[in-house]
A protein has these predicted regions:
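HotDog/MaoC-like acyl-thioester-processing domains
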Residues: 34, 42, 67-140, 195
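Conserved small/polar residues in nucleotide/adenosyl-binding loops
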Residues: 209-211
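Non-catalytic linker/capping segments at the edges of enzyme domains
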Residues: 1-20, 118-194
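Intrinsic-disorder/low-complexity, polar/charged segments enriched in Ser/Thr/Lys/Arg/Asp/Glu/Gln
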Residues: 19-23, 58, 72-74, 102, ...
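N-terminal, Lys/Arg-enriched amphipathic/low-complexity engagement segments
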Residues: 19-51, 56
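Small beta-barrel nucleic-acid-binding modules, principally OB-folds
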Residues: 52-66
């Protein structure tokens, strides 16, 4: 199913049920199971709602059970610690009273500190690169696959992704475990830093399973 940016922003608008308890809507993005990126993004929003003055700087997530895209998700936030400059939160996502996902994040005051990133590999300007849908369509034009599968691979996403290296979606060649892409929201995402972080959390699972 296609997902516009407006659809994703609606998914990130959680309902507060009680102190540290939130509910998120679900959407059929990759079939009957909830797309993992949706749960990561919603869990980040739930945790951040309890730390309004700090910004997430690290997180880790564990998928415990498949989620049902036909049902909402309950997010229980546990306030592990609030220190002088850091806060730690744990979030458990539940459906039908059972945990489907476990999440932890650390939040930090805005201040200078050490930063780490991989070296820049001389990526070309994005204006000269094709978007992922165009690249995928070119690879699939001679593939004998069902139209439903083809449509799933080519469906619209809430972010525009422009890969630096073209990679076949069905038969990728052996390569180093590094992927360079340019990406941006496919529309106006506003100025809230939390929403931008949640969009990145959502996108993280797009690349992991290459959909």
């Amino acid at each position: 199913m296609d997902t516009d940016l407006s659809d994703l922003l609606a998914l990130l608008d959680l309902t507060s049920l009680d102190d540290d308890l939130f509910q998120g809507k679900s959407r059929n993005i990759v079939g009957p199971r909830i797309f993992g990126g949706q749960v990561i993004a919603q869990a980040l929003v739930a945790a951040a709602r309890t730390v309004p003055a700090r910004t997430a700087h690290s997180l880790q997530a564990y998928f415990l059970r498949p989620g049902d895209a036909r049902e909402p998700v309950i997010y229980r936030v546990e306030r592990i610690r609030d220190g002088g400059t850091f806060s730690t939160r744990r979030v458990v996502a539940e459906q039908r009273g059972r945990p489907i996902f476990d999440f932890a994040a650390s939040f930090h005051n805005a201040e200078d500190g050490p930063t780490h990133q991989t070296a820049e590999h001389g990526a070309p300007d994005p204006d000269g690169l094709a978007d992922e849908q165009t690249v995928t369509a070119d690879f699939l034009k001679d593939e004998d696959i069902s139209e439903n599968f083809r449509a799933a691979l080519l469906r619209r996403k809430p972010v525009e992704i422009r890969p630096v290296t073209r990679r076949h979606p069905l038969r990728p060649e052996k390569a180093e475990p590094i992927r360079q892409v340019w990406l941006r929201a496919a529309g106006e995402a506003g100025d809230d830093p939390l929403i931008h972080q949640a969009l990145l959390a959502y996108v993280s699972d797009l690349s992991l399973i290459h959909i």
